[in-house]
């Protein structure tokens, strides 16, 4: 297995931070699995795929909703079938909304928690299952400095990212002895389409 080209799977991979991660891994010789809510035929998704192909990466692009168990089962099964290994999985997909804590609706809170926290858990779940089969792997959860310090008018995002950090620490302890390394990145504000909406 070590002689095969390595593979990275990235959720929210069509644009923004996901695309930046994909480009860096392609530059380092990885094949790339991109999962996104966008259809792979979308012009923005196609631009990313083209750039990765030009860097020499073989790309599998899959429309997948991280809030959907069937979608995520399908995503990981397709990735495994195509490449036969998952060296790195980056749980990058996420959303954000703004508002004072006391003004938020149930719907606003539940949407961010479902995508940013539960969607990350779902990504980690399937990543771990496949990595346990091969005996190694690295999972990287995209958290935020908001999950460390709190940020006014970002209560939902802060709650979710605090949860992601707890998930990361727990999973790292569960699988660290099994050859799987789990970490979180905590970037500050990044200029991406998510932050411009």
Sequence positions of predicted segments:
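Active-site helix of classical SDR
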Residues: 124, 160, 168
